[in-house]
Amino acid sequence: MIKEIIVIAILLISTLSFSQVTSSSPYSLFGIGDQVHLKSVEEISMGQMGGALNSEYQLSFTNPASYGNLSWTTYVFSGGNKTNVVDDGENQQTSSAAALTYIALGIPVNGNQGLAFGLQLNTAVGYSLLDQTFDEDGTLAEIDRYYGNGGTNRVFLGYGYKFPFNLSLGLELAYVFGSIDKNVSNRRNEVQLGTQALTDSNIKGTTVKLGAHYVQNLNEKLNLKIGVAVDLESTLKEKGDQLLYTFINAGDDSGFPIDTLNSDTFTSTIKSPLKTVLSAGFGEDNKWFIGAEYTFQNPLEFTGGIYENINFYRYDKFSNISVGGFYTPKMNSLNNYFQRVTYRAGINYQKTGLVINDTDINEYGISFGVSLPMGLKLSNVNLGFEIGKRGTSDNNLIEEKFYNFRLSLSLNDKWFRKQKIY
C-alpha cells in the first residue's frame, strides 16, 4: 500500500466573514479536525505556557482572569504558516497551510476590570490522501481517495475583575460554529463503476470558561504568579447530509454520476468534558518570567450519526505539559533597541488523546520567539517559531514533523481612559 499526501489550503477573509483555512495534516481527518492552540503568539512561543501571565498591555487567551489586569486598550491579530513533513515509513511528502488565527480587542474598564472579545480559529480540516493497492504482479488493483476541508471558528467574550488583594477572577463565553466537507472515492481496475461518498456537515455550540489568577509579592521585585482556568463541560451538535453514489470509472474522480445508492441526513454529538489548566511561575514584571503549565481532560465523546460503528480510532485522556518563559533586557531603554526586545522560549509535550489502531498519537515541540517594539510605544510585532513531531510511522501510521511560523501585531492605545485635569 502506498500513501501519497497532497494538501491544499485556502484562506478567504473579509469584514463580514472569517473563513476557515484547511489544515495541512492527515490527522485532521479524525473527529472535527486539528484542535488549534487557543493561545496568543506570545504564549505559544513559550511552549504554550500562559495561564499564569497577567500583562497590562498583552492578551493572554488561556486565562480570562488576566483581563482584569489590562491598563491599555489592546488590539491584536495573528496569522501563520504550518509546514508538515509526513512519513509513512516508505515515503515522505511535504505540505503547508497558512491561516489567520485570531483577531481580538481587549479594553480596560475602571482600572480593575477588563473586557476582551474576538474571533479565533478553533479546529481545522485539510487533507488529501491517496491509497493504492497493487496485485502481486505489480498491477494497480484499487485506488481509494480521501478529501477533507473546513473546520470550526469561535467568537468569544471574556471578562476579568481584579480585587485589591492581588486576586483576579474571570469568565469567558464562546460560540463555536463551522462546516466540514469530506469525500471518499473508490475505483477498481477493470470495474466500470466507481463509488463516491460525500459528507457535508455544520457544527455549532457554546462553551464556558472560568479563570482565577493570584499574585504573591516575594520581595520588591520578585513575584509568584498562579493561574487556574477551567473549561466547563460542553456539547457541540453536528448536523449534515450523506450521499453515496456510483460514477463512471474514467481513471480519475471526475466521472459522471450514475446512480444514487443512499442519501440520508444525520445528527451527531461531540461532548467535551471538563478541561483544567494549572499554571505557576515567578519573575519580575516587564523583565523576566519562567513558569510551567499542566493541562488535562477526560476523553472526548463522539456519538450518533457519522461516528457510529467506528472502531479503528478513539479518544483517550488528553494532557499537556509546558515549560517556558521570557526575558526583556531593559524595557525602557532609549539608546539600544535590542534591549527593549522581548525574547521567549519554551517546550511542551502533549498526549493528544487520539488513539489509532491502538496506538497513542503524541506530540512534542520546541518553540521560541521575539516581540519587536514599534517605536517607543508598547505596540509590538510578535514573531513565533515552533518545531516538533506528532505521531509515529509504526503500526501502519504516519509520523508528522512540523515547522510553524506565526506573526501577530499588538497595537496599544489609551482608548476609554479618563484624562487627568490639573
Say what each PLM segment does.
Residues 1-24, 422:
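Bacterial Sec-dependent N-terminal signal peptides
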Residues 20-422:
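Subset of outer-membrane beta-barrel
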